[in-house]
């Protein structure tokens, strides 16, 4: 089976951070059967905009 499609280049995260200066991106990635967690905090309100 070809699982290459599941790989995500690390450059993508840095690129997104640079393109969205208004938000602080905190990521926790575990590839041992654990889910991908992405939390975006608004710098002004200090509240989560998105958790997924």
Swiss-Prot record:
Plasma. The reactive center loop (RCL) extends out from the body of the protein and directs binding to the target protease. The protease cleaves the serpin at the reactive site within the RCL, establishing a covalent linkage between the serpin reactive site and the active site of the protease. The resulting inactive serpin-protease complex is highly stable. Belongs to the serpin family. The record marks 23-24 as: Reactive bond. N-glycosylated; contains glycans with bi- and triantennary side chains. Keywords: Acute phase, Glycoprotein, Protease inhibitor, Secreted, Serine protease inhibitor. It is found in: Secreted. Residues 1-20 are annotated as: Disordered. It comes from Equus caballus (Horse). GO terms for biological process: acute-phase response. One of its GO terms (cellular component) is extracellular region. The lineage of its organism: Eukaryota, Metazoa, Chordata, Craniata, Vertebrata. This is Alpha-1-antiproteinase 3. One of its GO terms (molecular function) is serine-type endopeptidase inhibitor activity. The keyword Glycoprotein applies. The keyword Glycoprotein applies.
